[in-house]
Amino acid sequence: MSKVAEVLEIVKGLTVLELAELVKAFEEEFGVSAAAPVAVAAAPAAGAAAAEEEKTEFDVILTSAGDKKINVIKVVREITGLGLKEAKELVDGAPKPVKEKIAKEEAESIKAKLTEAGATVDVK
């Protein structure tokens, strides 16, 4: 059995506390650090970018009806299929979601229609 294989077998038999002691001993003996601060700092940024790329469902939030409330109610009815009363309640109760968990293209299209009607809209 080679030296490397022997050391590996010994390490396999160690407890977690013994492994922690071994790491400390290596750090002291060879003047190195087991921590990798550069890799740890870069990981969250990469993770955040991946999370943004993976987002496939969006919510269209009506934040304000603006001055042309009647036009906004008409567009909300067209988009949601709600009745007049329900659409008016949604518009009056802003900020409220108009549509949830939809594709980005559809969300942008709805935002454009509502903005054109005079509303203030967020896509999240």
Curated annotation (Swiss-Prot):
Disulphide bonds in the chain: none
Entry's Gene Ontology BP terms: translation
Family designation: Belongs to the bacterial ribosomal protein bL12 family.
Keyword Zinc-finger in record: no
Function comment: Forms part of the ribosomal stalk which helps the ribosome interact with GTP-bound translation factors. Is thus essential for accurate translation.
Organism listed in the record: Desulforamulus reducens (strain ATCC BAA-1160 / DSM 100696 / MI-1)
Name used for this protein in its record: Large ribosomal subunit protein bL12
Gene3D superfamilies given in the database record: 3.30.1390.10, Single helix bin
Top-rank lineage group of the source organism: Bacteria
Key words, A-Z: Ribonucleoprotein, Ribosomal protein
InterPro entries with a match to the protein in the record: Ribosomal_bL12 (IPR000206), Ribosomal_bL12_C (IPR013823), Ribosomal_bL12_C/ClpS-like (IPR014719), Ribosomal_bL12_oligo (IPR008932), Ribosomal_bL12_oligo_N_sf (IPR036235)
GO annotations of cellular component type: cytosolic large ribosomal subunit
Subunit comment: Homodimer. Part of the ribosomal stalk of the 50S ribosomal subunit. Forms a multimeric L10(L12)X complex, where L10 forms an elongated spine to which 2 to 4 L12 dimers bind in a sequential fashion. Binds GTP-bound translation factors.
A single MF term (Gene Ontology): structural constituent of ribosome
